[in-house]
């Protein structure tokens, strides 16, 4: 059993932040998270290492929210049913919620442990967006009321791991996958109990090293959600058996570290991944890959996002050269400097 103290977990979280920010030049040039409005393609939010920004014109001009100047935001998420509501996870202050498009932020941390400070990801229930799961440095948490109260959902995770990513089954919301620094877990009971599903990943004795395998991203196949992709620090993996057995794919990729995965809902066999080696695209469910980095000044990709309205439009956040946009399925990229809008009224 690999039980860690809060101090050790904080050290691991700090190490993760350092590793993820290798190559950063300026704070505002490191894009930590990208959140796209579910119905209005003009609106998007990004978090950098020093601020949160909002654009109302597809990234041409930006409003900076000063309320986060003293906090480092680690992830952003827009409520898919009430998109004026935004959640921000921070490095040192847990969860903040905003009800008005980014203007006013309030802490929503009741029920979170005192040492839960680093939030990695939020995931919404597919039909009840007030139900949210949070991946944190000390495990998985759940709220049924939009963040008013949180409860731990860690039963079955025998080792205390940093939970880096969570994915919820699009058709059966009782089924969850959690990516941790010790591999992958699945829950068939909305997080009430978890089962380790590491067959085919790196050997168990190596996982006992704690940081031997970080699962940074999990994505479901568009057609068959029993097929799941996992982007890790040791490569890209795929399962066709709900995680009971994993296989390594993308052996031709030049870098093992995968920070993000996107699947095209219109062309289900098309995958995108991002990492320190840039953006790579596969037309055949991960069997073959080509680099898609034309126009990128930095290949260190930290965040990827696909427009929910048009799968040809992609956004890439880099560690070093800011935000980019592609309108041709990643064939070319155009920089989007965080240029201030002349009028920042709501």
Residue ranges of model-derived segments:
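Bacterial N-terminal signal peptides that target proteins for export
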Residues: 2-13
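Extracellular glycan-interacting surfaces
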Residues: 12-346
């Amino acid at each position: 059993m690999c039980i860690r103290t809060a101090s050790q977990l904080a050290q691991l979280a700090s190490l993760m932040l350092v590793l993820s920010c290798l190559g950063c030049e300026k704070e505002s040039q490191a894009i930590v998270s990208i959140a796209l409005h579910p119905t209005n393609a003009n609106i998007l939010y990004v978090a950098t290492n020093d601020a949160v920004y909002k654009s109302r014109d597809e990234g041409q001009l930006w409003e900076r929210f000063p309320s986060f100047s003293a906090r480092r935001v680690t992830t952003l998420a827009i409520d898919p049913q009430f998109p004026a509501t935004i959640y921000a996870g921070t490095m040192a202050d847990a969860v903040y919620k905003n009800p008005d498009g980014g203007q006013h932020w309030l802490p929503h941390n009741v029920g979170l442990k005192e040492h839960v400070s680093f939030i990695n990801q939020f995931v919404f229930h597919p039909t009840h967006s007030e139900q949210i799961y949070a991946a944190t440095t000390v495990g998985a948490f759940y709220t049924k009321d939009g963040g008013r109260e949180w409860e731990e959902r860690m039963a079955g995770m025998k080792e205390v791991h940093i939970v880096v990513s969570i994915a919820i089954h699009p058709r059966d919301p009782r089924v969850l996958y959690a990516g941790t620094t010790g591999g992958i877990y699945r829950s068939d009971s909305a997080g009430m109990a978890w089962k380790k599903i590491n067959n085919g990943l790196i050997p168990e004795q190596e996982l006992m090293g704690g940081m031997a395998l970080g699962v940074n991203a999990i994505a479901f196949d568009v057609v068959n959600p029993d097929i799941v992709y996992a982007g890790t620090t040791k490569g890209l993996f795929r399962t066709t058996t709900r995680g009971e057995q994993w296989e390594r794919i993308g052996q031709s990729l030049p870098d093992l570290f995968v920070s993000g995965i996107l699947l095209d809902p219109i062309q289900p066999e098309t995958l995108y991944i991002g990492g320190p080696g840039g953006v790579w695209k596969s037309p055949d469910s991960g069997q073959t890959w080509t680099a898609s980095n034309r126009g990128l000044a930095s290949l260190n990709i930290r965040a990827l996002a696909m427009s929910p309205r048009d799968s040809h439009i992609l956004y890439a956040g880099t560690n070093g050269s800011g935000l980019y946009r592609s309108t041709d399925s990643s064939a070319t990229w155009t920089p989007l400097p965080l240029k201030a809008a002349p009028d920042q009224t709501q």
